[in-house]
Structure formats: C-alpha cells, structure tokens
Amino acid sequence: MARITVEDCLKQIPNRFELALAATYRARQLVQGHTPKVDAKDKPTVTALREIASGQVGIEMLKKVPS
C-alpha cells in the first residue's frame, strides 16, 4: 500500500490551509456519491488526498461550494 504524505500534496497546492480546505471539499463530494478520480480503496479523506497528490484535483475545489 502506497502511503500518501502531506509533502506530496503540497507540491500541487503549496498553501497547507488551502490544501486542507480542498481536501475537505473533495472528501465531502466523494461521500455524497461523486465518482473518484483515482482507485478508491480507502476512506474518502485519503482518496481526496490521493487525487490532489496525483494532480487530478486542485485549487479549483475552493471555487466550488459543496452542496
């Protein structure tokens, strides 16, 4: 199992506060039923961080308000 680290995510979103918000918004979307963009074997929070680290989800999450 590959481990996800904050450093991997900070390469995509350098501001750790924006990173936390983007991961939170994306995790909420995943809980609500949105399709994951990476292999989703983990909890929604880990999946959201994996998406950010891979560059498939980024700062644009802050412009979208979760419903």
Curated annotation (Swiss-Prot):
* UniProt xrefs under Pfam families: RNA_pol_Rpb6
Q: Which reaction does it catalyse?
A: RNA(n) + a ribonucleoside 5'-triphosphate = RNA(n+1) + diphosphate
| Enzyme's top EC category | transferase
Question: Single GO cellular component annotation?
Answer: DNA-directed RNA polymerase complex
The entry lists its GO molecular-function terms as: DNA binding; DNA-directed RNA polymerase activity
Record keywords: DNA-directed RNA polymerase, Nucleotidyltransferase, Transcription, Transferase
The catalytic activity of this protein is classed by the Enzyme Commission as 2.7.7.6
This molecule's function is given as: Promotes RNA polymerase assembly. Latches the N- and C-terminal regions of the beta' subunit thereby facilitating its interaction with the beta and alpha subunits.
Supply the name of the protein.
DNA-directed RNA polymerase subunit omega
Q: What organism, scientifically named, is this protein from?
A: Ralstonia pickettii (strain 12J)
